[in-house]
């Protein structure tokens, strides 16, 4: 059985200093959680004009679950060590905003190989729950 759903994915803009919202209609197996589908789409990236890869494409999603309205995203080491042309906060909030937009999810906790006690790119502590941040989102694609 499949389900159809429109999701909002947040990718980096061309300069990597802001997020671009990309609405997408997806078809997925109802045995797979929509948050897993969202993360797979973010990792895969997009060909949409004005949207650029925000997460290293060889990142692996090790696990994802929702407990008490917090989505726990456990990613492989590549997430922390491989680079994309996006500022640290853009990468973090591409995940947070994409998942926080889903029903039943208020916040996001990011782990790397099960560990959240680390600094992402020496800039952002992962030892916290992140919430939607609309300040990073470009309102107009022509701003790229």
Regions found by a protein language model. Give the residues of each.
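Bimodal "functional hotspot" detector
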Residues: 1-144
